[in-house]
Swiss-Prot record:
Species name: Prochlorococcus marinus (strain AS9601)
GO MF term set: ATP binding; CTP synthase activity; glutaminase activity; identical protein binding; metal ion binding
This protein's name: CTP synthase
Gene: pyrG
Region (Amidoligase domain): 1-267
Family of the protein in this entry: Belongs to the CTP synthase family.
Description of how activity is regulated: Allosterically activated by GTP, when glutamine is the substrate; GTP has no effect on the reaction when ammonia is the substrate. The allosteric effector GTP functions by stabilizing the protein conformation that binds the tetrahedral intermediate(s) formed during glutamine hydrolysis. Inhibited by the product CTP, via allosteric rather than competitive inhibition.
Length: 536
């Protein structure tokens, strides 16, 4: 039977609950426990699939095709465990499910209310993850901040949850902020005291406090927090600002987070094996020469919009003992100036996914610059589509080529809508989503990188390479190095006589892990290193 850990946050938003939950998952897994982590998000959207990246950051796609919060990416990367659509719950999806049940008559004419129906549905979702994953420990992160109106149904649900299980089957962790007042030279505990008071008023007594701070917390402060918040002093956990999110599990291990959590769950504190993780941090802190990577996108004002891409680059650099020197380049700025202005000094170029017209011509110019100047290049999803358009216009003698998404009237739609998408009306959850197989072509860079005949990658798209133009592309020097098993969909393309030029229709960034970088990102960094070595 599963045990349950609930992670709440107080004082401020973006306090780091997701990293704490993911780090605890890593620590538990290092002790031999199986873990699944879910996120309860308090917004009314059914999922983040149609939300602006500027507001929400990236949409993380699970194996089974769910469009989820970016925190699920942290969960997967830290625990190396695949999550499913069950691991992402929003207020919108809860209300949708309850209203659908009411319309079907499931409540037998009863009055449908927040308590018990909404809170009951939330509890059922948590139990469903436990039943589906069969994990030893289920960690649940509650989005938002204690005191927010939006989070109240979730907090009430996790309060009720302790009545569903034995008391030693559940633990509550509260992540909070201890601000340092520079003028007085003091760390203040009052905001945390009030946050815990608010949590208690709901009926939840936290078992552990994880205290975010940029200054070390002494024993006197821990004792004060213990007394005012009703938490054992050993369960007051210091969480200092870290040089990398990947070093957080090690610092929380040192503070005893996992040990104390297991104590509340009445589980054995097994021997912890973090040798590989410690080696990862050693490599991260002792890199070799820098690699200047330009990420050419349209949402660069918010780095979280490309979170998994950045982490995948970081994983590859750690593996290759390189220092990631990331250059954020606005595709629109390239449109207004020139690619050379922004890309002349970089060692590699990445064009990630996206939607819509804005910035597309800048991306195409960046790809042309990478191709002509032999700069290692990797295109992802829309990045592949832009690479196809660039080749069609500048090499394959189709100067008016485009995508039917960008120009519905283009005479040469080298990228077109997938046939199964033609009658789709709704935007949310209707794309080609989740894991699909890709058969690799022999004697290609792609095949050599993966060293597999068939790979499985995550997708999120409506548009695809138009096979009507396949032969003209092949005749002009393009190589198709990966397709769907039936050969209908082009998944991976590359160029010969180039240090590294690959583009894929899928999203490899979602499968990259610290210590296990994705082959396409590792290949990009290695090619950049090789090119630098040759030039020196």
């Amino acid at each position: 039977m599963s045990k349950f850990v609930f992670v709440t946050g107080g004082v401020v938003s973006s306090i780091g609950k997701g990293i704490v939950a993911a780090s605890l998952g890593r620590l538990l897994k290092s002790r031999g426990y199986s873990v699944s982590i879910l996120k309860l998000d308090p917004y009314l959207n059914v999922d983040p699939g149609t939300m602006s990246p500027f507001q929400h950051g990236e949409v993380f796609v699970t194996e089974d095709g769910a469009e989820t919060d970016l925190d699920l990416g942290h969960y997967e990367r830290f625990t190396d465990t695949a999550m499913t659509r069950l691991n992402s719950v929003t207020t919108g999806s809860i209300y949708q499910a309850v209203i659908n049940k009411e319309r079907r008559g499931n409540y037998n004419g009863g009055t449908v209310q927040v308590i018990p129906h909404i809170t009951g549905e939330i509890r059922e979702r948590i139990h469903r993850v436990a039943a589906n994953s069969n994990a030893d420990i289920i960690i649940t992160e509650i989005g938002g901040t204690v005191g927010d109106i939006e989070s109240l149904p979730f907090l009430e649900a996790i309060r009720e949850f302790k009545n569903d299980v034995n008391r030693n089957d559940v633990a509550y962790i509260h992540v909070t902020l201890l601000p340092y007042i520079k003028t007085s030279g003091e760390i203040k505990t009052k905001p945390t005291q009030h946050s815990v008071k608010e949590l208690r008023s709901i009926g939840i007594q936290p078992d552990l406090l994880v205290c975010r701070s940029d200054k070390s917390i002494n024993e006197a402060l821990k004792k004060k927090l213990s007394g005012f918040c009703g938490v054992n002093i050993n369960s007051v956990i210091e969480a200092l600002d870290a040089d990398s999110i990947y070093s957080v599990p090690l610092s929380l291990k040192k503070e005893g987070l996992c040990k104390e959590t297991l104590k509340y769950l009445d589980l054995e504190d097994k021997k912890c094996d973090l040798k590989n993780w410690e080696q990862l941090i050693h490599n991260l802190r002792n890199p070799g020469d820098p690699i200047k990577v330009a990420l050419v996108g349209k949402y660069i004002e918010l780095g979280d919009a490309y979170l998994s891409v950045v982490e995948a680059l970081r994983h590859a650099c750690i593996e290759q003992r390189a220092l990631l020197d990331l250059h954020w380049v606005s595709a629109e700025m390239i449109e207004n100036n020139s690619a050379e202005t922004y890309l002349n000094e970089v060692d590699a170029i990445v064009v990630p996914g996206g939607f819509g017209n804005r910035g597309v011509n800048g991306k195409i110019s960046a790809i042309k610059f990478a191709r002509e100047n032999k700069i290692p290049f990797l295109g992802l999803c829309l990045g592949m589509q832009c690479a196809v358009i660039e080749w069609a216009r500048n090499v394959a003698n189709l100067p008016d080529a485009s995508s039917s998404e960008l120009d519905p009237n283009t005479p040469n739609p080298v990228i077109h809508l997938l046939p199964e998408q033609e009658d789709v009306v709704d935007l949310g959850g209707t794309m080609r989503l989740g894991v699909y197989p890709c058969r690799l072509t022999k004697n290609t860079t792609g095949k050599n990188l993966y060293d597999e005949d068939v790979i499985y990658e995550r997708h999120r798209h409506r548009y695809e390479f138009n096979n009507y133009y396949k032969q003209s592309f092949l005749d002009s020097g393009y190589k198709i190095s990966g397709t769907s098993p039936d050969g209908r969909l082009v998944e991976l393309i590359e160029l010969e006589n180039h240090p590294y030029f690959l583009a894929c229709q899928y999203h490899p960034e979602f499968l990259s892990r610290p210590g296990k970088p994705h082959p396409l990102f590792k290949g990009l960094i290695k090619a950049s290193q090789d090119k630098l070595t040759q030039s020196n």
